[in-house]
């Protein structure tokens, strides 16, 4: 594990934990942990260091762990889905799978004694979960239609895979980047519609031409936390669309690793270092670490409204299509994994892609196969054309599995969306994002309507409620929403949302 530059600030408890023992050290102890059981483990190993392997202790479900994978660009193969389902089916109803807002999968129900086998099975099908938690670079996101979209400017798939391989030592764990001051999100966009939500990443690359050469402008510092929300800002830098992206990513990570605050945990994301130094000094130090002067930013090319990729769309490959399917709040079962793999093999070329909206895309579907695919039973649940509120509903895990969540989110999100759709006609889809706590995993600030879990007082009792954000925009001219209402009890939420949809989004009551 790389050591941070010496500092006089008081280290937070997580930094002390990392100094006591390298997070990656638990790789060599996983068989031992499996044999002694979770109750006998050192709490620091069980509750924190296992996260370096992508294994998460869940206090809400004692003894049942969560695994978070790494899926660059959200691209999976059918054999990988089948392998995951084959492993998880032993847990029956205790197993569930969530698509995340970083094109990733989180698998729930894992028993500690099964983790050695689980990690071996991941490796056997080319998957890894290493460095997917704690102070590491998280899943690297990209356009979910990279290589398929006729309008794309650059196919980012191989670049994103190469960057992940570099930062994780091809999935084995890279100690150069396992001791960051805090987690770090990277995204690379190759299209015109900001499918990656560049503004909410610590580091984002967006397409731009410099003197006729296609490359990327660079954005830094975007993040959500319980105490602050900050959109990414321009670094005023451009790099060509080649290994320079990896070099610059490494340089920025090294600067962050060696200079970022390790004191107050609420002030350790990259933007706090940029605030302390100013963007010009930060750019200069990054340039020195990069080993060359940084070219100034070029004109931006992201000028489209964001697409959600649901429905049938022709690919750049003649006669082939991709089909986006809506997965309600991203929740899957083991049977769903089997079915998605079967559909990908039967109708396409065995590929399934995940989106940041928690949906899936089946690719390479021939024109002649579309009618049969669209008649498949799974598509009655995972619709290519969902109703306008369900279509844009995103939700974090909520209190069912997360100890940070203040409210239940997923089932409530589905129920309220369906109820309002039965009562209202909407002229366009409205994106509603739910997050169970201020950590904002559900990204409420990018939604038309964002709902953040809170405990509120009603009739003298503390009940589940939300704060409401309005005005988030994605795609061209993206910006974050602002908190507009606080302390709304969840039982009052349907009426409040109904009024918002009528007053702000042109909804009209249906006549019955």
From Swiss-Prot:
This is Ferredoxin--nitrite reductase. GO terms for molecular function: 4 iron, 4 sulfur cluster binding; ferredoxin-nitrite reductase activity; heme binding; metal ion binding. Its EC number is 1.7.7.1. The lineage of its organism: Bacteria, Bacillati, Cyanobacteriota, Cyanophyceae, Synechococcales. [4Fe-4S] cluster binds at residues 396, 402, 437, 441. It comes from Synechococcus elongatus (strain ATCC 33912 / PCC 7942 / FACHB-805). Siroheme binds at residue 441. The gene is nirA. It catalyses: 6 oxidized [2Fe-2S]-[ferredoxin] + NH4(+) + 2 H2O = nitrite + 6 reduced [2Fe-2S]-[ferredoxin] + 8 H(+). GO terms for biological process: nitrate assimilation. InterPro entries: Cbl_synth_CobG-like, NIR_SIR_4Fe-4S, NiRdtase/SiRdtase_haem-b_fer, Nit/Sulf_reduc_fer-like_dom_sf, NO2/SO3_Rdtase_4Fe4S_dom, NO2/SO3_Rdtase_4Fe4S_sf, NO2/SO3_Rdtase_FeS/sirohaem_BS. Belongs to the nitrite and sulfite reductase 4Fe-4S domain family. It is an enzyme of class 1 (oxidoreductase). It holds the Pfam family NIR_SIR_ferr. Keywords: 4Fe-4S, Electron transport, Heme, Iron, Iron-sulfur, Metal-binding, Nitrate assimilation, Oxidoreductase, Transport.
